[in-house]
Every structure is written in C-alpha cells, then in structure tokens.
Amino acid sequence: MAVLGAKMHPRSIELASVYNVPVYVAGTFSKKKGTLITKGDDMENNKTVTGIAIDKNVSKVTIKKIKNKPGTAASILKPLSDQSISIDIIVQNIPMDGYIDFSFSVSDDDLGRVYDILMSQGNLEFEDVIQGKGFAKISLVGTGMQNAPGYATDMFNALGEENVEIEMITTSEIRITCLVKEEDVEKSVKSLHSKFELDKD
C-alpha cells in the first residue's frame, strides 16, 4: 500500500519506539524485502561534523542607513524574491537613531539585477547600496549541530588562526556557514579539515 500512498501511522511507530518493538513493513503479495524499523543510535551521538561545503561566486550587498520600521526586511526582500533571486545569509544590525544597515549574500550572476531592483523601489529610503564580488560561503556540515556546543567557536578559531576575516555568519540545524573572501577559501578548508579531523576515519 505504501506504493499507492499508504503510510505508517506516526502513533504506531512512536509506540514501537517506546517499547523497543521492531516494525517490519512489507508487501502482502510480494517476495521483495521490506523495511525493518528498529531502534538505532541517536543521530546526535554520531560524529557531528561530517564535511565541508564550499559555494564560490558569491556577492555581498549592504544597504546603508535604511529607515527602520515594521516591514523593512520584507520590503527589501520581496521584490528580489518576485524576480526569483535567491538570498542566503542575512544580517541586520542594531538600529542607531532609527536607521539600520541591512546586508545579504547573493550569487554573482544576480548582483546586477539586485542593484537595479533596489534602486527602483520608491518606497525604500536609504543612503547607499554597497556591493562587492569575490566572496565564498564555507559551511561546516553535520548532524545535531544545534545541540553540540563549541563547534561554532572551534570553526571561528580555526579561521582566525589563518587570519581569515569572516564577513557574515548564518547557522541552521545542519550547518554553520561563514562568508569569507574567495582568496581565503583554500587555507580555510585546510584549517577546518585539520581542526575537525575530517581526513580521519
């Protein structure tokens, strides 16, 4: 039935897990092997950092001294989203005298369009748009990173030891991402590989 869309009821799997009962899912009239669901190690107990991801050809955009008011972020990002421009790292600084700086990263290919779109928004009041190419995103990838203290600090220390300047930072449950200069990518990756012993089994 699973092929036709039937699903295991979440409550049945939950009870099986609580009482450590293995669940075997198979077709009634098929001789093919089914799926055995058993209790295993928690993901958070496995090796946390599993790899490093690199994304080059990244640009940084900073809107200087934009009026801080409800809906400001949406008024900046929605016109870009409407044009299918993907935004990744987003940083908004603390308001000063009612104004903020708003920064984000985009691909190099979209940078020209971003500037034109921002300049065409009559409802946005800002002092300047600063943009630059030559950046890359380096991500520490793993499982259960949100529950593993110290990994972000270790990453930042490793980059700092190589005099790598971190431009922007973002985190999620499975990654910690830093925006750095593209020229610093090679030494950054080597340093992180060494710090987290990714070359070892």
Residue map of PLM features:
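C-terminal catalytic "cap/lid" subdomain
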Residues: 1-171, 175-201
